[in-house]
A protein has these predicted regions:
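Short, solvent-exposed loop/turn elements at beta->coil junctions and helix N-caps
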Residues: 42-48
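Short amphipathic alpha-helical segments
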Residues: 14-41
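Short, flexible turn/loop "capping" segments at secondary-structure junctions
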Residues: 1-2, 50-53
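A broad, structure-centric signal for solvent-exposed, well-ordered loop/edge residues
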Residues: 17, 48-49, 70
Length: 117
């Protein structure tokens, strides 16, 4: 399994609960389409972190392999290119609902289970 990690802060006129709900709805859509296997949305507890400037939110998206991750990325990219049918329009709305509030300090990393099976 591959695990795509995202660390971010949120900004703008949205509550933490609204933002997390919007992100969850987007990721749930990708899971329902079998574009991802699972996901987690976590938040730093009590500000406890030893890495200076580590963003508050941590999102983990699990995929079977790089191919599935690429399919998920392409799904979102297609939505952003405005080649939309009705279902894609809903994905775009869900993506925009959380993504517009992600601060510029976003960080990404891709990890895998070790050792490879």
């Amino acid at each position: 399994m591959d695990i795509y990690h995202v660390w971010c802060d949120i900004e703008g006129d949205i509550t933490d609960k609204e933002w997390a709900h919007n992100l969850r709805e987007f990721l749930k859509s990708l899971k329902e389409e079998n574009k991802i296997e699972s996901y987690r949305i976590t938040r730093c507890k009590l500000g406890f972190r030893s890495i200076q400037d580590l963003p508050e939110w941590h999102i983990m998206v699990e995929t079977k392999d790089m191919s599935q991750l690429e399919t998920a990325f392409q799904r979102v990219a297609k939505v952003e290119q405005h080649t939309l049918d009705e279902i894609e329009s809903q994905i775009k709305i869900k993506h925009h609902a959380f993504n517009q509030h992600v601060a510029d300090n976003i960080q990404h990393a891709l990890f895998r289970d070790w050792p490879d099976e």
